[in-house]
Amino acid sequence: MSALDRLTTLDTSFLWLERPDAPVHVGAVAVFEGAPLLDERGEPRLDELRARVLARLDRLPRLRRRLARVPLDLDRPVWVDDPDFDIADHVRAVRVPAPGDDEQLRRLAERLHSESLPRARPLWDLHVVTGLAGD
């Protein structure tokens, strides 16, 4: 990457359109077989998952970068390395409310996606959802 890794024009427009009550970001929901991610109590192996994600971040260095605004906003923001990067801020567990059906998962996804990502850190999150019916 170049010395100045500038945000694209499209991403910058999303950034400026965003409001606290209306975040403008992309999200996805994927359902996987839970057993490999769970310990004997049925809880997510977060430390192991965080270690696996962290070990692969060198392939996607932007996931360790946060935005920095240009003085007076005279140009698009740039991506800068986050010296305070903590994988625990990005990979978390959350339990879907009972009964753990598709509707509850949809509501949880809506709630998580409606929250703004903190701009002081890299702009991504990974939520491991437990409590789905059939887990």
Q: How would you label these PLM feature ranges?
A:
Residues 1-135:
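Non-catalytic N-terminal regions of enzymes
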